[in-house]
């Protein structure tokens, strides 16, 4: 369980994110100093192009392969995957033996609230940030009304401008932690009770 940094700033989970952030700093500065553009926590591009400007919140994404995550409107699903070393080869073999890809066993239909949260997470974690006008057009409210954004701004992890909400350089380093703060209780319960 991820605890809010506002309620338990010295929780074990938060300290792990702090350690991850410290490990992240040196290579991040090295890449930036050498002209790379950071587009997400783990993605740096050396020759930015117009492809780097594409929004991260609305594309239809159909993933292929073992563990691929797909986003099709309000449907979110993934093919089976494992992180256990001794199970990886078997999972890939099972995937390669699949003949019917029209059936998914690991997915669900997102509620409007979950779609809103997904839009926030996907855009906030991307270097262009969240477009406020697009958010308001989709969800009928201003993202400035979300208390968590004010709390992240107080920590200087986001920059809230007239038209966008973007992670700061420090916030980008904590993006694994920040993204989890936006996960709904319903999704968190599904994650915690999922059995493989």
Kindly give the residue locations of the regions a language model identified:
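C-terminal scaffold of the Radical SAM
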Residues: 1-139, 195
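A short, conserved structural fragment
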Residues: 153-163
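Short amphipathic alpha-helical interaction segments
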Residues: 139-154
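Short, amphipathic alpha-helical interaction segments positioned at domain boundaries
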Residues: 172-196
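Basic, amphipathic "hinge/linker" alpha-helix immediately C-terminal to the N-terminal HTH DNA-binding motif
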Residues: 115, 165-172
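Extended hydrophobic-aromatic, low-complexity segments
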Residues: 132-133, 144-145, 160
């Amino acid at each position: 369980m991820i605890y809010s940094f506002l309620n338990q700033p010295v929780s074990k989970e938060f300290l792990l994110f702090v350690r991850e952030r410290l490990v992240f700093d040196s290579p991040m500065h090295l890449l930036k100093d050498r002209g790379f553009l950071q587009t997400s926590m783990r993605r740096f591009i050396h020759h930015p192009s117009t492809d780097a400007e594409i929004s991260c919140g609305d594309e239809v994404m159909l993933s292929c392969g073992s563990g691929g995550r797909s986003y099709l409107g309000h449907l979110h699903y993934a093919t089976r995957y494992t992180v256990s070393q001794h199970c990886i080869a078997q999972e890939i073999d099972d995937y390669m033996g699949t003949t019917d890809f029209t059936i998914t066993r690991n997915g669900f239909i997102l509620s409007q609230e979950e779609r809103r949260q997904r839009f926030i997470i996907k855009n906030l974690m991307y270097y262009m940030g969240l477009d406020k006008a697009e958010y308001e057009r989709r969800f009928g409210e201003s993202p400035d009304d979300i208390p968590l954004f004010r709390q992240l701004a107080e920590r200087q992890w986001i920059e809230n401008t007239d038209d966008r909400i973007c992670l700061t350089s420090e916030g980008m380093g904590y993006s694994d932690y920040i993204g989890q703060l936006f996960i709904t209780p319903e999704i968190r319960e599904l994650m915690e009770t999922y059995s493989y």
